[in-house]
From Swiss-Prot:
It is an enzyme of class 4 (lyase). Is synthesized initially as an inactive proenzyme, which is activated by self-cleavage at a specific serine bond to produce a beta-subunit with a hydroxyl group at its C-terminus and an alpha-subunit with a pyruvoyl group at its N-terminus. It comes from the Bacteria. This is Aspartate 1-decarboxylase. The modification Pyruvic acid (Ser) is found at S24. It comes from Methylocella silvestris (strain DSM 15510 / CIP 108128 / LMG 27833 / NCIMB 13906 / BL2). Its cofactor is pyruvate.
Length: 155
């Protein structure tokens, strides 16, 4: 089994840090559902401001709140306004990778969803892996892709 990307919240901003809590990250259930992230699921958090990388579990906040609250020890690594990448994982046999299509959500400064993307791995005629980023409208985007900036795949 290999650890692969299950879903991603890219560029979501910390709305609060709560040191006096038992731990975890509190997220808007609507964001979690759209990215396929479950309550109590362990996620990796990468802070784009500080470079800190931590692992914690998800608890659900109020639906529609757009919250991203770091709790307990995690609050020491992320401050309100910090931009994060939150990534869940799945474990699959490598042969199953072409069946995987993790959701990737990008966010504006107010934690509104800007883009709903999916990662796609296929094999070409020679059996080589091909990686793509697929937009909600089905457009294939060229990696690397800057958040919020579409680049069409070269023909």
């Amino acid at each position: 089994m290999r650890k692969l990307v299950g879903g991603k919240l890219h560029g979501i901003r910390v709305t609060e840090s709560n040191l006096e809590y038992h731990g975890s990250i509190t997220l808007d259930p609507a964001h979690c559902e759209a990215a396929g992230i479950l309550p109590l699921e362990f996620v990796e958090i990468w802070n784009k401001n500080s470079g800190a990388r931590i692992t914690t579990y998800v608890i659900l906040g109020q639906r529609g709140s757009r919250c991203c609250v770091l709790n307990g020890a995690a609050a020491r690594t992320c401050q309100p306004g910090d931009e994060l990448i939150i990534c869940s994982s799945v474990y699959l046999d490598g042969a199953e990778i072409t069946n995987l299509s993790p959701a990737v959500l990008t966010f504006d400064a107010n934690n509104n969803i800007v883009e709903r993307l999916h990662y796609s791995v296929t094999r070409d005629g020679a059996g080589h892996y091909q990686f793509g980023i697929v937009a909600e409208d089905g457009e294939i985007l060229q990696p690397p892709l800057k958040s919020g900036m579409r680049q069409k795949r070269a023909s």
